[in-house]
Amino acid sequence: IMPSLVGSEMCIRDSSMANVLYGLKNTHKITLENIIQHTLSVKMAIKKSLLVVDMPKNSYSNVKKAEKNAKLIIKKTGCDAVKLESNNKNFTIIDRLVKKKISVMGHIGFTPQFKKKFKVEGDTKEKANKLINEALLIEKAGAFAIVLECISPKTAKLITAKLKIPTIGIGSSSFCDGQILVTDDMLGISGFYPKFVKKYINLNRIIEKAVKKYTREVKLNKFPSTNNFLNGTKRK
């Protein structure tokens, strides 16, 4: 929410909240209800940022299901677009959604909903060509933008050069048109920090200090002080 309040152009309500908020090992257990509920809280706070919602795993396993659930997400949350992770099979799904006037963002490279091992993608010529072709097919299907996750710098640069739609990088170098990070990662709240993450502040440490100080003051009867009393009631 905070990035959208200070000038970020886009906010993605991603299924990675499974790891960040619930402490789960992967994103597979996030449900449609989870994503809708969390998106509602974000929608209430943001003003100008484009709001994109990540469709949970298994919510778009076929064209009919994808259309039904995408429409439900948009209706319930008022978001601007949905995001689909690519498995090299859902180009027809993207095409169908776009024809139904639903804005779609693609996602290639490391796709947490379909891949278990966290590694650099597109680091060989053969793998790079597959990713380039995949990106072009997603663009052809009608996606308005595409996330490149954990893709080698050289391949990310090639993809960005070949596409007409914007590429949004996460762990894919500066050779992308835009960048995203998990808010909790950049603020230093989460406990896992991949190499591509830059912590702009260590909120974990700040929060820890604040809670310790609060606990100490309560035990020493320093909080609440008279300044915190209601109606000017003096402490006896």
Predicted segments, located by residue:
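Structural preference for beta-strand elements that scaffold enzyme active sites
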Residues: E9, S41, L50-D54, D80-K83, ...
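Single conserved hydrophobic/aromatic residue that forms the stacking wall/gate
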Residues: I1-G7, I12
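N-terminal small/glycine-rich loop or linker at the start of catalytic domains
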Residues: S16-G23, I46-P56, K99-D123, T183-K195
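Active-site mouth loops of central-metabolism enzymes
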Residues: S8, G23-K29, V53-K65, F114-L131, ...
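Conserved anion-binding
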Residues: L50, Y60-S61, I74-A141, C176
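Glycine-rich, proline-tolerant flexible connector loops at the mouths of alpha/beta enzymes
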Residues: I12-Q37, M55-Y60, L84-I94, A143-L158
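C-terminal alpha-helical cap/extension of soluble enzyme domains
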Residues: K154, I165-K236
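Active-site/ligand-binding-proximal alpha/beta "capping" segment
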Residues: K68, L72-I74, T124-K164, K212-K213, ...
